Curated annotation (Swiss-Prot):
Protein's UniProt name: Peptidyl-prolyl cis-trans isomerase
Residues of the PPIase cyclophilin-type domain: 5-161
Activation/inhibition comment: Binds cyclosporin A (CsA). CsA mediates some of its effects via an inhibitory action on PPIase.
Gene Ontology MF terms: cyclosporin A binding; peptidyl-prolyl cis-trans isomerase activity
Organism ancestry: Eukaryota, Fungi, Dikarya, Ascomycota, Saccharomycotina
Organism of provenance: Candida albicans (strain SC5314 / ATCC MYA-2876)
Length: 162
């Protein structure tokens, strides 16, 4: 299984590292997209992008590295790709899942759950989990709001593969 990371800041202050294990064995295409966007090896990716939507007791959303507001992003396969499968469930905090605009519209946007989210099962593809830095996830969560607007600018300063 691939291991990737984000080094995250809030308003320029370093928060720390979030490490993820990707489910290459269950959703290889989805995991490979995220891995390659973490390394930036295709010439684009997550480095320098933001968490544009953070809702406490729900999730942290990021991955729009083209428009930085939730309307953009792209996958390594082109703009969008199909839902691979829904084997993994949104059954706990710290899960990595694809954000989308309906069936088969995966790009680069993702979210990290902060609570179990069973209503998302069968609609969003879970492709990894936080293995280290859940405290950083909780810190980012504290900068969110009910509307999703963040009180601080949350930036992925560095990302890559370990």
């Amino acid at each position: 299984m691939s291991t990737v990371y984000f080094d995250v800041s809030a308003d320029g202050q370093k928060l720390g590292k979030i490490t993820f294990k990707l489910y290459d064995d269950v959703v290889p295409k989805t995991a490979e997209n995220f891995r390659a966007l973490c390394t930036g090896e295709k010439g684009f990716g997550y480095k320098g992008s933001i968490f544009h939507r953070v809702i406490p007791q729900f999730m942290l959303q990021g991955g729009d590295f083209t428009n930085f507001n939730g309307t953009g992003g792209k996958s390594i396969y082109g703009t969008k790709f199909a839902d691979e499968n829904f084997v993994k469930r949104h059954d706990r905090p710290g899960l990595l899942s694809m954000a989308n605009a309906g069936p088969n519209t995966n790009g680069s946007q993702f979210f990290i759950t902060t609570v179990p989210c069973p209503w998302l099962d069968g609609k969003h593809v879970v492709f990894g989990e936080v293995t280290d830095g859940l405290d950083i996830v909780k810190k980012i969560e504290s900068f969110g709001s009910g509307s999703g607007a963040t009180s601080k600018k949350i930036v992925i300063e560095e990302s890559g593969q370990l």
